[in-house]
């Protein structure tokens, strides 16, 4: 067995996973009350999941879990810096060149496995992108929550309506990331999932021979 993820990283991940899910769900409850992009979510979607007329519930959940999501994100950023984990996570120029070969290998269209360390090129870009998305989501969220007190931030984001658009785009991007992440976890098998739970991954005996 080899250590894959530290205890700190696992704890932060398993706090972030449900927090992000609740933030997305409560965000949709809030969005229903002011559908600025009509038709993006069809009526059957609202009816199926009973989303209509739940603005107060959505706001209560969003503002409560939002603080947990933000604090967890700050702790994660601190962990990256203190532990040096950022060196394994942040992509290099070579990683961007390896994106296509990595995807082709993942789809079984390329036999040769691209170079990689703890994370492959696509994982590095996706996880770093998620970190940037989270930061943008928090900033745009504060901008539309306190537009008068944080008028400078609102202007930086292009105005109130633009800040709302950015916040909505972040939510959609996180939904896509969420789906792809779960699919990849399922595809990678139990060994990788166990590593995020227990911290260790079982290696094949042939791997080192």
Describe the role of every protein-language-model region.
Residues 1-209:
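Membrane-embedded alpha-helical bundles that constitute the cytochrome b-like, heme-associated redox core
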